[in-house]
């Protein structure tokens, strides 16, 4: 009896009741990708035609979309299989960011408002930058504005190589991001700089400091590497990871999960440089997962490579590639395992700007027993509550099990 949470990062399905308050009314990541594919607007060298997600559809993705928005996207008309359990969930936390979504999935909605840096130039208070430069021995910084990570590296990467000054920027999320060249600036030096920055931004209630290393020699050749590292504040209450760890359960985390939870209760962490590699790491982790254990995985490419970059065709291709590997995961499950596939927020690649979008998320469940609709859940925390129930852990403080009387 084991439990798995698989987060398809940013794979929202629209319909959030409070989306208008975020400027996201009508945003629908999966729905708009499916519509673009059906209209021939997402054809590329990697994929063509309607969106093909037969295995996610068999788990109830079409029904989950219908729960969220009242309609099924084109290409997801296939009915869920007889053993599928499915629904959607709304976020209770105020943010539409990575920590808020993941913490709530793990049973802890964020009870406060994150701090954000203003969309001004400069974006950061002068005294913060003075402290940062003094603590790290810097002559100054570059950037100091809201920006897309790939764009600002292209814009300022050459100046960074010339001056040795790191590129500091933010976004609509509660983040302070630092980009630097892995070789010229040094990866370890970048990590130390981020570690020094973490306490400096605490007074602004900033969720994450993010190291964004890159390589290349000119604007046309700069590219970010897989050595990103997030320095997050820890969750304000015990999560399902903490509960499992306290009970001496085997915990395996995949991808950036350990960073998101500030390495608290995250057990053995396996990393990879792509969704495909992460999927392989997940299968390895599952193969080694003890009875009573918890595996928590994040698949980041949907968000970072395609959502933020507003690449509809790339996002569609990534969804189809993930779907094609799903049978490997399903075949590796034991009869008494519980699998929940969900998302942490949306990032509609057809939407304006480059930020996350406030959306409901799918909740697709495989547990070998209960099937059918779990409806539209009012909190992501219901997933954490259900995992705790399944693993016979102490109950989470927030959320309600999908099956109050047991699966």
Swiss-Prot record:
Gene3D superfamilies recorded for this chain?
A: Alkaline Phosphatase, subunit A, Phosphopentomutase
Signal peptide start and end residues = none
Instruction: Kindly list the GO CC terms recorded for this protein.
Output: cytosol
Binding residues annotated for Mn(2+) 1, in chain numbering: 9, 344-345
According to the lineage, what is the superkingdom?
Bacteria
Q: Which reaction does it catalyse?
A: 2-deoxy-alpha-D-ribose 1-phosphate = 2-deoxy-D-ribose 5-phosphate; alpha-D-ribose 1-phosphate = D-ribose 5-phosphate
Keywords on record = Cytoplasm, Isomerase, Manganese, Metal-binding
InterPro entries cross-referenced by the UniProt entry: Alkaline_phosphatase_core_sf (IPR017850), DeoB (IPR010045), Metalloenzyme (IPR006124), Phosphopentomutase_DeoB_cap_sf (IPR024052)
GO MF, one annotated term: phosphopentomutase activity
Is Lipid metabolism included in the keywords of this UniProt record? no
- Per the UniProt entry, the Enzyme Commission number(s) are 5.4.2.7
Query: Where can this protein be found?
Result: Cytoplasm
Q: How is the cofactor bound?
A: Binds 2 manganese ions.
Its function, per the record, reads: Isomerase that catalyzes the conversion of deoxy-ribose 1-phosphate (dRib-1-P) and ribose 1-phosphate (Rib-1-P) to deoxy-ribose 5-phosphate (dRib-5-P) and ribose 5-phosphate (Rib-5-P), respectively.
Q: What is this protein called?
A: Phosphopentomutase
What organism does this protein naturally occur in?
Bradyrhizobium sp. (strain ORS 278)
């Amino acid at each position: 009896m084991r439990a798995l949470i698989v987060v398809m990062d940013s794979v929202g399905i629209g319909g959030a009741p409070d989306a208008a308050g975020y400027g996201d009314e009508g945003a629908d990541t999966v729905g708009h990708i499916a519509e673009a594919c059906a209209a021939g607007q997402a054809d590329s060298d990697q994929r063509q035609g309607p969106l093909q997600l037969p295995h996610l559809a068999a788990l109830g993705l079409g029904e989950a979309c219908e729960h969220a928005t009242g309609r099924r996207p084109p290409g997801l008309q296939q009915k869920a299989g007889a053993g599928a359990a499915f629904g959607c969930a709304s976020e209770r936390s105020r943010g539409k960011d990575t920590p808020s979504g993941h913490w709530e999935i793990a049973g802890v909605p964020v009870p406060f408002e994150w701090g954000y840096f203003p969309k001004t130039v400069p974006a950061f208070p002068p005294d913060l930058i003075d402290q940062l430069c003094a603590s790290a021995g810097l002559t100054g910084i570059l950037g100091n504005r809201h920006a897309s990570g790939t764009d600002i590296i292209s814009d300022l990467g050459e100046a960074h190589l010339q001056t040795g000054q790191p590129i500091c920027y933010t976004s609509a999320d509660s983040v302070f991001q630092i980009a630097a060249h892995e070789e010229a600036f040094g990866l370890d030096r970048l990590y130390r700089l981020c570690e020094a920055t973490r306490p400096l931004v605490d007074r602004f209630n900033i969720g994450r400091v993010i190291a964004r290393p890159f390589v290349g020699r000119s604007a046309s050749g700069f590219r970010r590497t897989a050595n990103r590292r997030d320095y997050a504040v820890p969750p304000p209450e015990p999560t399902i990871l903490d509960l499992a760890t306290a009970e001496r359960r085997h915990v395996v985390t995949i991808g950036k999960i350990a960073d998101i939870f500030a390495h608290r209760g995250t057990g053995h962490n396996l990393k990879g440089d792509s969704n495909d590699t992460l999927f392989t790491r997940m299968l390895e982790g599952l193969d080694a997962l003890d009875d009573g254990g918890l595996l928590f995985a994040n698949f980041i490419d949907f968000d970072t490579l395609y959502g933020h970059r507003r690449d509809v065709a790339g996002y569609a291709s990534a969804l189809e590639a993930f779907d094609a590997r799903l049978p490997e995961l399903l075949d590796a499950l034991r009869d008494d395992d519980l699998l929940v596939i969900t998302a942490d927020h949306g990032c509609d690649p057809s939407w304006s700007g480059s930020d996350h979008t406030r959306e409901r998320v799918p909740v697709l469940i495989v547990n070998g027993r209960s099937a059918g609709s779990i409806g539209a859940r009012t909190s992501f925390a219901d997933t954490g509550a259900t995992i705790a129930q399944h693993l016979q852990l102490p109950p989470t403080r927030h959320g309600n099990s999908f099956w109050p009387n047991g699966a």
